[in-house]
């Protein structure tokens, strides 16, 4: 009977149990797991088989640790072995983690066209997740996306749009959920595609800052927001078939190199530090002057950050701009469609394109402010 392992956590119950499509078997006396969904066989060692069978019997984690101790495995090693197995099985979809969270530890947020419900089993997790969003909205209303997060030992588990369970360290919760939501929102928009671009508005018209991670999109976005631009997103922008641009207005993500500028522009702000999967330490700054809805791009800026030198704008023709945009585009199915190509063509035809070479974000800010105010 696959009852699951139950661990009492304050007023909630956390249940670890084999996934419904995962089965345990012996082949030539060797323990294996078969996943019907993934169509794969996973071989277990004897210790892994012991832990799996105990969880399948409904043993608590405390019981698993204790019975491993009876096999002369010290407690810290028993915990490590058990969690190594749980982590691997969760990632492989072999183990389900289920829980119930009180609705009193929750909030709703607006992200572009979406209203997101977030619940967590403690205030620290909730605070970390709240730092992701610019617009919190706790009025009654229908949510189209739900995120739940739960802390078990030192692991955080969360579930969202796809119903699957995902895990991360507590310091990585907000960046991991942001990456998860971004990927799912891109995949849910089958008709469009996305660009690695920050998006802003100046007097109702759009500015795209294009560049791969590390090009300085977020730092320059911080500068332009301080100059009075409206914020629409700092990382990814969705492009519709009509060429309309729609950013994902998560709170502005700032890596450690931008914190000095952040403290100068927002001296009273004191945010939580988070750790991304790539090891980067980041902080999130909610932007109040946020643009809601789509934009028509009037300026396309390709960022070229260098170690030193004077900031310079160089005009690009439509062909060069198109090639660069295609290099930075990605779609849900991995292909840029003909409709996507013509959407890019509409954007390029209606916008002025430039390469911005710069080393200091303040100099780049001045050039872009002049450009967007028709002074360049």
Language model features: what each stretch is:
Residues 1-49, 53:
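Acidic, low-complexity/disordered tracts enriched in E/D and polar residues
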Residues 217:
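Conserved lysine of the Walker
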Residues 135, 139-186, 361, 368-370, ...:
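Charged, amphipathic alpha-helical linker segments immediately N-terminal to NTP-binding catalytic cores
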């Amino acid at each position: 009977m696959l009852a699951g392992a139950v661990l009492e956590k304050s007023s909630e119950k956390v249940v670890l149990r084999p996934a419904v499509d995962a089965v345990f078997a012996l082949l030539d006396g060797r323990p294996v797991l078969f996943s019907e969904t993934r169509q794969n066989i996973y071989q277990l060692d004897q210790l892994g088989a012991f832990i799996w069978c105990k969880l399948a019997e409904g043993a608590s984690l405390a019981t698993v640790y204790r019975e491993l101790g009876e096999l002369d495995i010290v407690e810290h090693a028993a915990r490590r072995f058990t969690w190594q197995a749980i982590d691997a099985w969760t990632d492989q979809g072999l183990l389900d983690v289920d829980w119930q969270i009180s609705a009193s530890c929750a909030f709703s947020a607006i992200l572009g066209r979406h209203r997101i419900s977030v619940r967590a089993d403690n205030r620290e997790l909730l605070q970390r997740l709240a730092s992701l969003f610019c617009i919190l909205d706790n009025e009654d209303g229908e949510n189209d996306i739900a995120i739940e997060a739960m802390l078990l030992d030192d692991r955080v588990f969360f579930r969202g749009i796809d119903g699957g369970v995902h895990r991360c360290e507590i310091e990585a919760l907000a960046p991991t959920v942001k990456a998860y939501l971004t990927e799912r929102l891109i995949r849910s928009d089958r008709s469009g595609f996305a660009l690695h671009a920050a998006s802003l508005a100046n007097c109702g018209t759009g500015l795209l800052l294009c560049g791969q991670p590390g090009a300085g999109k977020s730092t320059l976005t911080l500068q332009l927001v301080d100059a009075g631009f409206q914020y629409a997103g700092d990382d990814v922008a969705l492009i519709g078939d009509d060429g309309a641009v729609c950013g994902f207005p998560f709170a502005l993500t700032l890596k450690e190199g931008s914190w000095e500028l952040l403290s100068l522009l927002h001296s009273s702000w004191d945010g939580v530090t988070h750790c991304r999967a790539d090891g980067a330490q980041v902080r999130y700054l909610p932007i109040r002057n946020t643009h809601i809805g789509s934009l028509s791009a009037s300026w396309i800026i390709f960022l070229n950050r260098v170690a030193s030198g004077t900031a310079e704008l160089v005009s690009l023709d439509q062909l060069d701009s198109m090639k660069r945009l295609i290099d930075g585009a990605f779609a849900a199915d991995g292909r840029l469609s003909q409709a996507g190509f013509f959407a890019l063509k509409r954007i390029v035809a209606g916008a002025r394109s430039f390469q911005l070479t710069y080393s200091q974000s303040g100099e780049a800010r001045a050039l872009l402010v002049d450009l967007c105010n028709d002074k360049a």
